[in-house]
Design a protein with these regions (language model features):
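Conserved N-terminal substructure of TIR/SEFIR domains
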Residues: 1-60, 180-201
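Short glycine-/polar-rich loops that comprise or flank the Walker A/P-loop
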Residues: 6, 60-61, 102-105, 124-126
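Short glycine-enriched loops at secondary-structure junctions
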Residues: 14-16, 109-115, 134
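Arginine/glycine-rich "motif VI" loop of SF2 helicases in the C-terminal RecA-like domain
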Residues: 31, 92-103
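Conserved TIR/SEFIR loop-to-helix hotspot centered on a Trp-containing motif
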Residues: 69-96
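Nucleic-acid nuclease catalytic cores
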Residues: 99-117
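C-terminal interaction surface of TIR/SEFIR-family domains
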Residues: 117-201
Length: 201
């Protein structure tokens, strides 16, 4: 895999409750000089979701995986296995995908460091990072990981990025208003573009 690949696959919930953490992940990735990728980046009805995810995984050197939302949900109550499945795809690509995938690296988040052992014990050898549901904690962990695993000393510290993220969130309503975007209709592409514009202004 080419050294210049700075694409980061984001595997996490996309619901409203998780949105603060998702936004923190995307902001941190972009602020650190990388490109955030996820299944929301393209709306193509001719391409099924699994194929789209496989394509993105194939193209990304790095991965951010949050397995904190595997609890039962809905009626009937069933567990949510999308995130563990996509984590498995990423780890499988690294192990079996050939030479260009061997440099893949990922960080795994959960609410608590050892909670995952109760439902996905096969990854017990992995280093799980706890965010406790707090964007600030996630940003600190993610920024340090990106800096270490990319070898890029220009990636800022997580506390500094966290402060920038707070300022960005405060400015966001005015930014959306200027772009004539209702917060409820903002797509992943819109949010990416807004973050890039804010950071490069």
């Amino acid at each position: 895999m080419a050294a210049e690949n700075r694409d980061v696959f984001v595997n996490c919930p996309f619901d409203t409750d998780y949105r603060p953490l998702f936004n923190a992940i995307v902001f941190t990735i972009i602020r650190s000089g990388f490109r955030a990728r996820c299944a929301l980046e393209a709306d193509n009805a001719a391409e099924n979701r699994f194929d789209k995810i496989c394509k993105i995984v194939s193209e990304c050197r790095y991965g951010v995986h949050d397995i904190s939302r595997t609890e039962v949900d809905g009626n009937p109550p069933l567990p949510r296995f999308n995130m563990p499945l996509e984590l498995g795809l990423f780890l499988g690509a690294k192990k079996y995908g050939g030479a260009r995938h061997r440099e893949k690296s990922c960080i795994i988040f959960d609410r608590e460091q050892y909670r995952f052992q109760r439902y996905i014990s096969d990854i017990a050898g992995q280093d799980i990072h706890a965010h406790r549901g707090e964007p600030a904690s996630l940003i600190v962990e993610l920024a340090a990981w990106l800096r270490i695993h990319s070898g890029d000393a220009q990636v800022p510290g997580g506390v500094a990025i966290g402060n920038e993220f707070i300022a960005f969130e405060e400015a966001l309503p005015a930014i959306y208003a200027a772009r004539q975007l209702d917060p409820g209709e903002v797509t992943f592409g819109d949010y990416n573009a807004v973050v890039v514009q804010y950071l490069t202004a």
